[in-house]
Amino acid sequence: MDLRVAAYGVVTDEGGRLLLARWTEGRRLAWTLPGGGLEPGEAPEDAVRREIREETGYTVRVGELLGIHSRVIPAGRRVQKASEPLHTLRVVYRAEVTGGKLRYETEGSTDRAEWFSLPAVAELQRVRLVDIALRMAGIL
């Protein structure tokens, strides 16, 4: 079984909007939390800072650990063809923008980043992790 450990941020602004990134590597385009896989030896807090900067242009202060979501994806349901299941551990933090300017990632797994009101999030094509993390944060 393969293992992937990733870190994600629930980033909201003063108006309660949520920062999301549009993921392009799935079976379909879908909005997700900014974040991604840890580099070898990288701490989850550092990974979420790096990934948010890469995907959105913002620098953030990493706050409270909201939770860890564990999921096993059968081999036949993985995005990339594989013979083994994938165990994903997704570490979710609250994060706050401290600087930077909104921009899109180039040559990465996302192609857009945008702020959404919670009612607008409910209408988006999104990955399950968005709702899982919003429940962890007490927003849903």
Locations of the language-model features?
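A generic structural micro-feature
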Residues: 1-3, 30, 81-89, 107-110
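A short coil-to-beta-strand element that immediately follows conserved catalytic motifs
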Residues: 59-68
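Active-site-adjacent beta-strand/loop module that shapes the phosphate/pyrophosphate-binding cleft
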Residues: 71-102
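Structural motif
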Residues: 18, 63, 86-92, 113
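NUDIX/MutT-family hydrolases
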Residues: 94, 103-135
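Conserved Nudix-box catalytic region and its N-terminal flanking loop in Nudix hydrolases
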Residues: 17-54, 58
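Conserved N-terminal beta-strand and adjoining loop/helix that marks the start
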Residues: 1-18, 94
